[in-house]
Structure formats: structure tokens, C-alpha cells
From Swiss-Prot:
UniProt-recorded name of the protein: Protein piwi
GO MF annotation list: chromatin DNA binding; metal ion binding; piRNA binding; RNA binding; RNA endonuclease activity
Effect of residue 10 to A: Abolishes binding to papi
Known outcome of mutating residue 12 to A: No significant effect on binding to papi
Organism: Drosophila melanogaster
Length: 843
């Protein structure tokens, strides 16, 4: 498809009193679609309501399931959880530093109230843009700054009458009666006030000539072409205005949109030409893809392919039948090349949400550009490296881009006028905040403790330190499975493993070897069945490559059908120059899978259980999901963990099955210590955007009540509880003099939210790009810990992930929960054996 075809010039909207006048930029739509080339008389081109109305109506709506990204801290999810007795949530411990952020302060806070009106037209006008045009005749009356989405009007001017009646004419000289009904005031304290501010910002950004793709703005004129992979990167911005601790701040993050230059038509042509297989193969490769139509800069999800219709098919438009070929030529000056290609069907999700009506959008394959990356592309190292060279910006590059955006916004006349009309002015400098750097934590080994280091990486200390706990008789009964042709590589791996483990205090004896003569999945599984007859403590499989089917089968046999920890090592690993370093990591994993602990941190609290919880969707059935809970068993006493998994609905965001998992962890703790924990810190990951209120009402309160009941049964007071929501996917960034802040950096002021007990923590070092802080929102706490102790405890918990000898972005229990939930949802698709609950089998 030539570029000029896909980017046909837009024509001005024409007004029409019929329902077909809604056509403005989407393809033709049908309410009931039938596979007939003669056309459906009910089909007509339409346009939805403006994006400004959708922003107001849908801002609080949850999307994307349990692990959706939460860009600016749940933008419209307002829940006041800051304890009344908490005078200050700022800590004092640590070295103070001045940090720069990706926020800009709103210098002149508007001192006005926004007036909300509802507008009706008589006779009725279906097309929102026509409504906007008719009302714009009274711009002077409405005031210099007003927002109108075709139905709702927002302005700073209050009319004297409750209902103000005006008249106006359209471009076709049709006169309309306009009724403007007063709804109410929106004060600065209301969440809707911030929504309006965001709409004002979006309106001001129109002057930057950016394209709206999805919900963010991108600059196609600054696109970066990666021609060898038929791909473009569009730079853009994610923005949000919100009331922070003291000021209203504009958060700005640099983002990129992956735009593939290939179309759905190109993908279809690559599919099998065998008539018996072609349609099925097309559907496998096309369904659920997100596409962009350049003629209206809209994105759609492909829900079906209709092989019964072609661009020659007709539909009813403005009282006559018209083919798709003629429609696109007349509407967009686009000539469709292949008149025999099938049509694509996309459900109009926004329309369905508002009206519960089923409306479908009809699309032409050769006009649909594919967006995003598929699994094959993500596994292409060269492609990902080429992309990251543009998208992975260091702190200086990022701050330069932020300042350039601010300068562009404040020097574009159209943008400046919008902000001035609303009496708004942005600071030209990024917002600064004083943070603190917590001191290095001590890592406790069997024979001593060492500081974690400035970069929070203690890999080198394994040269002279023994792991904290190891089996007294070592790894004495285990098995390996390897192809006969790789016997030499197996010897190399085992020799390196013996040496690495010995230096860390883990004695590994020679395994029972099961040599196989091919590398088929079934051969490995049958060899595992032979292995288990000798009751091994662990099975190691040497495999030729990263075959997903083989890996899943090995894990399922070990964890679902049996209860034997498995370790899968690829042949490529044995040929790595850093084999001894890799062997050290494998030895640590083997020790963990046996149920032992490589290291610990100094923990001042006794009787403490830390819990991590996360959810992962099943890759086999997207309606199903698996929740994983990891709980520590008093790390001051025995440094062990407990894990449990349950199946739940992918839409069960509030995890109604959570309490039984907590109860199992409590029983295990009681079994090991002959008492229940006196303190519980629950780190809740996997919370979807907009669900904090539901989470607090139905999950937190439920846990509190059930803990009271559980402890009352043994005549104990309920434990001290802290419930903390962990958000790892944030757009918030901060920098230290053009560099990444070091691990242990805390921010608990200025950019935090006044209604929350929250803080940001940078807990890990990154070698490339810009570090992303993690947000912690304390929804509930009866712990009695000061803010700095809560922050320090959280940082300590980031030192205990045993797959990596360094800190992690989130507390280890969260990382373990994510790892386990992903393993079950991706590979096992069944609940693992209970006998594995005390072992790190999921590492």
C-alpha cells in the first residue's frame, strides 16, 4: 500500500438530517452484519461522540484486567486513606538529595469554578461536530474559555437563568433552538475538576500538530524509520494533570508508538494459498491485532474476518446503496487496489459500553496498518536492540526532551491562547523535590555479613561466602537428563557446578544420569518418569534450545503430575564464556529449590509475616487466571517461605479467593512456630487502574474482619496489619543531576498525593536507560511504624529475591508471586502439587 493511499486528505464534514450524517472519519459501521455481497440496508457510516466526551464519561472505568499499567498513580481513582493521626508521612533517615522530576508546576492555580451545563438542540442533531459548529456561533457569550463535547458544556461563566435558550444556524442554513441547562458547579476539590483540566491540556496540545492514536498524542512528522524491520517509531507524550501535595502538577512522560509499515493485507498474502487452510490461517494471524487506519488516525482491534464480503459489497448511505470502493474514493480520495479482498470486522467497544448495543466497524485490510509487536518480534534480539537504541533514553536525554516539550507548548500561539483563555500558566522548569538515600543494607551469609554495595549487587561476595542455609547432606540424590550427543557439554556443566557450589557450602554429589537419544518432548517426559522411580530430590534437564512446548511439558510433569523440582538448562549456557558465573547462579537456584536460603538481611521485627500476591492470566484461556500468594515464615527465625496458587476468573480483580490462601499461610506459620504471626505486611501487586475503592471496601475490610475471627478462635488479639498497594508500572521519573538516583532513594513529598499515605522508592540499579521508581500506597496500617521505618522495611524486602544477587524493583514476595503466577498461567495451566509449597520450585 502506497503511503499516499493510506493517508487520504480529510474533507470537511457535511451536515445531513439523516442518520447517515454521522460519517466523519470511521469506516462504515453495521449493527447487524451479514455475509452478503449485496450489501446490508442497515449499514451506514458513523462517527462516535468526540474524544473529550469519552474522556469525561470513561475516565473512572477499569480496563485491561488485573495487570494493567497505571501511568500516573490511578489518575482518577480518588480514595482518602491517609490516617488522620498521621501528621507527616515524610521520613527523616538518610542522606538528603535534591531530585529533578518529570513534572511541571501549574504556576497560576485557577481561582474559578467550572460551570457544568447540559445542551440540547431542536430539531435533534446527530452529528456532534455539527452541534459544536452551531454552538460556536455564541463563543463570545460562552466566554473565552469553554469546552463542549457535543452534549456537555463546561465554562467559567454562569448564566442568570437555569435554562438559557439560544438560536443558531448550521452551514446549511438550518436554524436550531439551543437549550443550555445548568447542571451544577465543579469545584477545585472534586476529581472531575482535574478531568476538565486534563481536557484543557489536551485542547492546548492540539496546537502542536500531534496525532491522537489511542489515548496518547504522537508526532508522525518526527517518526523514526527502522526499514530493515518494516517498522516506524512515533515519538509522543503521555500527560496528566493532578493535585499533588502542594500544587497542581503536569506529569509528562516520553513514549513511543510502534507502527509497522505492513498492512493486514500483507499478512493475509503471506498466509497459505491452500483454500482448505487459508481462512483459518488468516484468522489465526489477524484476530486480536490492533490496527491503525491512517485516514482517520483511529485504532481498532480486529474481531473477525468476513470472507463473504469484499470492497465491492454495498451498504446504504444517505438513501442510496454505495460500495466500499466508491465510499473510500468519495470520502477520502483513496483508491482501493484489490477489490476481492475480504473485509475486517471490529466491535465498537466504546459504543457498546455506552449503549449496550452491538455495533461493528467494517475495515479494509489494505488500509489497516498493524501496530505493536507480536511474540516473534519480541524474541528478535536484533529488532529489540534496534528499537531500544531510540526508546531507551538516559536521564539527560529524557530531561532534555521534557524541556523541549515544555518550550514547544509555551511557544505555540494556539497552545498559549488556550492556556491563557483558562488563566493557566505552566512553570518552564521541571519540578524539584528533596529525596533521601537510605544507607546500604547488610547481606547476611552463613559465615558473616557484607554490605550490599553502592549498586546493591553482591554477586562477587559469593567467592568467599557460604550460603546461609544448605542441606546437611548436600544434594545427594538427584538426576540429570541429557541427549547423548551432548555428553561433553553435560560434563562441562557438572564440573563447573561442582566447583561453584562447593565454594558456597553446597556439596553436590554425582547425579544419576539418564541419557536420551533424541530431544523430542515426549522423550524427556518419559525419561522423567524413569527418574522418579528412584525418588530424586531434583531433576536437571539439559535441552538444546528454548522450545516452549518442551519447557512446559517438563515443568508440568515435575510440578503437576509429580512433586519434583526441575532445573532446565539450555545447551547455549554450557558454551558461555562466563560459565562459572552462570554455574554459581544455577547452584543458588538448586539450593532454593531444595527449600534452603542463600542469604538474608538484618530484620529488627520478630513475629513478622510478609505476603506478596499477584495474578496472571492463562495463556490458554484468557477468561481464566491464577493468583499466587507467597508468605515469609518469620525471616528472623528460619528464613523460609510458603507458596500457594488458586485459579480465579481473569475478571476477578478483587480476588475473592484470597482469604483461603492467607488462611493456609497462617496455618503453615502456626505449624512451624507454634503460634500465629503478630505482624503482617501485605504487599498487593496486580491491582487494576481505578479499583482502589473496591479493593479497600471488599478486600482490605474483609481481611481485617477475617483476621479478627481467626485470631479470636485461639483467644488472641488480631495482628498488626499493613496493606500496601505496589505499583511498578509508573510514568513517574526522577533524576539526580542528570543521572539515575542510586538504590535506596526515597521520595515522600511534593509529587506524592495529599489524600494518600504513599511514597516512591528506587530500589535497584539500571545500567541502561532511566530507572523507574516503584509507588507504594499504604491503604491500611495498624503497625504503628513511623513512615521512615515502613519505607526502610520495604527497601529491605527488595534484597531477598534469590534469582538475582541484587535488589529488585519490588519486594521479593511480590516478585516471587509474579514469577509463580506467570509459571502457572503460561506453562502449567494447573495447580502445582502441595508438597512443593515450601520450596522455591518456581525460580
Amino acid at each position: 500500500m502506497a503511503d499516499d493511499q493510506g493517508r487520504g486528505r480529510r474533507r470537511p464534514l457535511n451536515e445531513d438530517d439523516s442518520s447517515t450524517s454521522r460519517g466523519s472519519g470511521d469506516g462504515p459501521r453495521v449493527k447487524v452484519f451479514r455475509g452478503s455481497s449485496s450489501g446490508d440496508p442497515r449499514a451506514d457510516p458513523r462517527i462516535e461522540a468526540s474524544r473529550e466526551r469519552r474522556a469525561l464519561e470513561e475516565a473512572p472505568r477499569r480496563e485491561g484486567g488485573p495487570t494493567e499499567r497505571k501511568p500516573w498513580g490511578d489518575q482518577y481513582d480518588y480514595l482518602n486513606t491517609r490516617p488522620a493521626e498521621l501528621v507527616s508521612k515524610k521520613g527523616t533517615d538518610g542522606v538528603p538529595v535534591m531530585l529533578q522530576t518529570n513534572f511541571f508546576r501549574l504556576k497560576t492555580k485557577p481561582e474559578w469554578r467550572i460551570v457544568h451545563y447540559h445542551v440540547e438542540f431542536e430539531p435533534s442533531i446527530e452529528n456532534p461536530r455539527v452541534r459544536m459548529g452551531v454552538l460556536s456561533n455564541h463563543a463570545n457569550l460562552l466566554g473565552s474559555g469553554y469546552l463542549f463535547d457535543g452534549l456537555q458544556l463546561f465554562t467559567t461563566r454562569k448564566f442568570e437563568q437555569e435554562i438559557t435558550v439560544l438560536s443558531g444556524k448550521s452551514k446549511l442554513d438550518i436554524e436550531y433552538k439551543i437549550s443550555i441547562k445548568f447542571v451544577g458547579f465543579i469545584s477545585c476539590a472534586e476529581p472531575r475538576f482535574l478531568q476538565v483540566l486534563n481536557l484543557i491540556l489536551r485542547r492546548s496540545m492540539k496546537g502542536l500538530n500531534l496525532e491522537l492514536v489511542g489515548r496518547n498524542l504522537f508526532d508522525p512528522r518526527a517518526k523514526i524509520e527502522i526499514r530493515e524491520f518494516k517498522m516506524e517509531l512515533w515519538p509522543g507524550y503521555e500527560t496528566s494533570i493532578r493535585q499533588h501535595e502542594k500544587d497542581i502538577l503536569l506529569g509528562t512522560e516520553i513514549t513511543h508508538k510502534v507502527m509497522r509499515t505492513e498492512t493486514i493485507y500483507d499478512i493475509m498474502r503471506r498466509c497459505s494459498h491452500n483454500p482448505a487452510r487459508h481462512q483459518d490461517e488468516v484468522r489465526v494471524n489477524v484476530l486480536d491485532l490492533i490496527v491503525l487506519t491512517d485516514y482517520n488516525n483511529r485504532t481498532y482491534r480486529i474481531n473477525d474476518v468476513d470472507f463473504g464480503q469484499t470492497p465491492k459489497s454495498t451498504f446504504s448511505c444517505k438513501g442510496r446503496d454505495i460500495s466500499f470502493v466508491e465510499y473510500y474514493l468519495t470520502k477520502y480520495n483513496i483508491r482501493i487496489r484489490d477489490h476481492n479482498q475480504p473485509l475486517l470486522i471490529s466491535k465498537n467497544r466504546d459504543k457498546a459500553l455506552k449503549t449496550n448495543a452491538s455495533e461493528l466497524v467494517v475495515l479494509i485490510p489494505e488500509l489497516c496498518r498493524v501496530t505493536g509487536l507480536n511474540a516473534e518480534m519480541r524474541s528478535n534480539f536484533q529488532l529489540m536492540r534496534a528499537m531500544s537504541s531510540y526508546t531507551r533514553m538516559n536521564p539527560k536525554q529524557r530531561t532534555d526532551r521534557l524541556r523541549a516539550f515544555n518550550h514547544r507548548l509555551q511557544n505555540t500561539p494556539e497552545s498559549v491562547k488556550v492556556l491563557r483563555d483558562w488563566n493557566m500558566e505552566l512553570d518552564k522548569n521541571v519540578t524539584e523535590v528533596q529525596g533521601r538515600i537510605i544507607g546500604q543494607q547488610n547481606i547476611v551469609f552463613h559465615n558473616g555479613k557484607v554490605p550490599a554495595g553502592e549498586n546493591a549487587d553482591w554477586q562477587r561476595h559469593f567467592r568467599d561466602q557460604r550460603m546461609l542455609t544448605t542441606p546437611s547432606d548436600g544434594l545427594d540424590r538427584w538426576a540429570v537428563i541429557a541427549p547423548q550427543r551432548n555428553s561433553h557439554e553435560l560434563r562441562t556443566l557438572l564440573d563447573s557446578l561442582y566447583r561453584a557450589a562447593s565454594g558456597m557450602g553446597l556439596r553436590i554429589r554425582s547425579p544419576q544420569e539418564f541419557i536420551i537419544y533424541d530431544d523430542r518432548t515426549g522423550t524427556y517426559v518419559r525419561a522423567m518418569d524413569d527418574c522418579v522411580r528412584s525418588d530424586p530430590k531434583l531433576i536437571l534437564c539439559l535441552v538444546p534450545n528454548d522450545n516452549a512446548e518442551r519447557y512446559s511439558s517438563i515443568k508440568k510433569r515435575g510440578y503437576v503430575d509429580r512433586a519434583v523440582p526441575t532445573q532446565v538448562v539450555t545447551l547455549k549456557t554450557t558454551k558461555n564464556r562466563s560459565l562459572m558465573s552462570i554455574a554459581t547462579k544455577i547452584a543458588i537456584q538448586l539450593n532454593c529449590k531444595l527449600g534452603y536460603t542463600p542469604w538474608m538481611i538484618e530484620l529488627p521485627l520478630s513475629g513478622l509475616m510478609t505476603i506478596g500476591f499477584d495474578i496472571a492470566k492463562s495463556t490458554r484461556d484468557r477468561k481464566r487466571a491464577y493468583g499466587a500468594l507467597i508468605a515469609s515464615m518469620d525471616l528472623q527465625q528460619n528464613s523460609t517461605y510458603f507458596s500457594t496458587v488458586t485459579e480465579c476468573s481473569a475478571f476477578d480483580v478483587l480476588a475473592n479467593t484470597l482469604w483461603p490462601m492467607i488462611a493456609k499461610a497462617l496455618r503453615q506459620y502456626q505449624h512451624e512456630h507454634r503460634k500465629l504471626p503478630s505482624r503482617i505486611v501485605f504487599y498487593r501487586d496486580g491491582v487494576s487502574s481505578g479499583s482502589l475503592k473496591q479493593l479497600f471496601e471488599f478486600e482490605v475490610k474483609d481481611i481485617i474482619e477475617k483476621l479478627k475471627t481467626e485470631y479470636a478462635r485461639v483467644q488472641l488479639s488480631p495482628p498488626q496489619l499493613a496493606y500496601i498497594v505496589v505499583t511498578r508500572s509508573m510514568n513517574t521519573r526522577f533524576f539526580l543531576n542528570g543521572q539515575n538516583p542510586p538504590p535506596g532513594t526515597i521520595v515522600d513529598d511534593v509529587i506524592t498525593l495529599p489524600e494518600r499515605y504513599d511514597f516512591y522508592l528506587v530500589s535497584q540499579q539500571v545500567r541502561q536507560g532511566t530507572v523507574s521508581p516503584t509507588s507504594y500506597n499504604v491503604l491500611y496500617s495498624s503497625m504503628g511504624l513511623s513512615p521512615e521505618k515502613m519505607q526502610k522495611l520495604t527497601y529491605k524486602m527488595c534484597h531477598l529475591y534469590y534469582n538475582w544477587s541484587g535488589t529488585t524493583r519490588v519486594p521479593a514476595v511480590c516478585q516471587y508471586a509474579k514469577k509463580l503466577a506467570t509459571l502457572v498461567g503460561t506453562n502449567l495451566h494447573s495447580i502445582p502439587q502441595n508438597a512443593l509449597e515450601k520450596k522455591f520450585y518456581y525460580l
